[in-house]
């Protein structure tokens, strides 16, 4: 288990403030957030690569807060691979054993062969990094990070430098690595689709603070904070305080709520949904994969996502009267912490 308690870091004007984080042994957690949120700083603090002002970092009941990086049994892999250009693939991988006092133990040769097979890199062991594709370099970087069976594998945006096709392949391999080796993994990304696919749990970070954390399926279906909802593309976020609306939405007190655009229904005829409104069509935007349609009534504007075929079927035009709405199960209750 990884336990980060009351972590405080100051790097120039940037701060990590009283950060709390728990990761179960063998868990795949994704640290998700926008650029400059502090994701990589947290990883490097766990790895011992940045100084901390205060706080405690425990791994498997061992206090590693003040240990040197080489004594933590933690590996970190970056998006730019960091392979040594003068070493071939097998030497780059074995370099991961440099701090092991028993690095000549036969168990590590067995470990090496298992990783080569798992990552499908047996045919490139003699090549130099300059002769490898981005995907091959990332596989080698992962093998180097995993050799020696670290307690924790830290991944800093491992997919961001890859083209889309290779990215999908490496995603599958990361999932396979975790399922096969049961290594505790913390991965940093700004891509919530990546996070949703790979993570068992997600911690969302912004401006050096954990905004929200929990099981990935729960957070992506119904985020609990305004920041998380906005970050994941939920455009319909409203403050409800009018007594009539509070009663209509079944809310006990003034609250923020969110509705995913894809959960809003539009029709030229009355529709059977829990919350039904009449209004007019506002702006219409073609986003290639879907059409974003604004539905406006006297109280607020809603964004709805429609497939192109359904949009064409409805023959919607700006200013056209429509019925729109959504179901109670799709109403997301949010707290303001941004």
Listing of model-derived features with the role each one plays in the protein:
Residues 73-75, 88-224:
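ABC ATPase nucleotide-binding domains
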Residues 4-7, 14-24, 55:
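Conserved beta-strand
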Residues 32-34:
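The feature captures the beta-strand-to-loop junction immediately N-terminal to the Walker
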Residues 12, 247-338:
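Non-catalytic connector elements of ABC transporters
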Residues 53-56, 207:
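Conserved coupling/switch loops of ABC nucleotide-binding domains, chiefly the family-specific signature
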